[in-house]
């Protein structure tokens, strides 16, 4: 986690009653962010790892084993994922991306930056994409997309937030369940 934790909180709540999926750990690269507070409040263990440790196989993989992590959901995590983790969790790690891929992905395409790019492009719709994590930023196979028309009333990308959050709420449960329970390679 890198930020506000809306995705994190909704995923934890979605799976809170599940007998098949357990959110075992929330990892962040910044201390004191709302995502950590939300996870703590919901009873999910948290860890803060600086960027240097997130890139160390000898730190990250033992932590994953300690918490018996079988599947990873990147929900607002803004760092590039190291190759060793991608190999270890091949087709067991998904990313929630705040725009329609492949058009609006890659380095720098997050948060308000991606929404500004969509607005500047003149696109008629926006949305959210869930994809498998690969060695290319936002380049993994697409699992699901949810689309919504861009209203002329949305004067700026910041006015898209409520609509974007509504899409994310619909998308999270469906695709997380699909990915965790129904898809294997």
Where are the model-predicted features located?
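One-carbon transfer enzymes
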Residues: 1-185
């Amino acid at each position: 986690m890198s930020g506000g934790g809306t995705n994190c909180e909704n995923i934890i709540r979605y799976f809170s009653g599940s007998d098949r999926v357990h959110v075992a750990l929330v990892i962040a690269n910044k201390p004191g962010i709302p995502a950590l507070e939300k996870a703590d409040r919901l009873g999910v263990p948290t860890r803060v790892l600086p960027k240097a440790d997130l890139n160390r196989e000898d730190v990250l993989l033992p932590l994953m084993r300690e918490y018996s992590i079988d599947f990873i959901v990147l929900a607002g995590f803004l760092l590039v994922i190291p190759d060793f983790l991608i190999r270890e969790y091949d087709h067991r790690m998904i990313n929630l991306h705040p725009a329609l891929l492949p058009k609006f992905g890659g380095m720098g395409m997050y948060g308000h930056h991606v929404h500004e790019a969509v607005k500047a492009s003149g696109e008629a719709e926006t949305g959210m994409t869930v994809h498998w994590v690969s060695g290319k930023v936002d380049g993994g196979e697409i699992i699901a997309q949810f689309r919504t028309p861009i209203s002329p009333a949305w004067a700026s990308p910041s006015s898209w937030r409520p609509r974007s959050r509504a899409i994310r709420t619909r998308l999270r449960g469906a695709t997380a369940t699909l990915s965790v329970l129904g898809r294997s390679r």
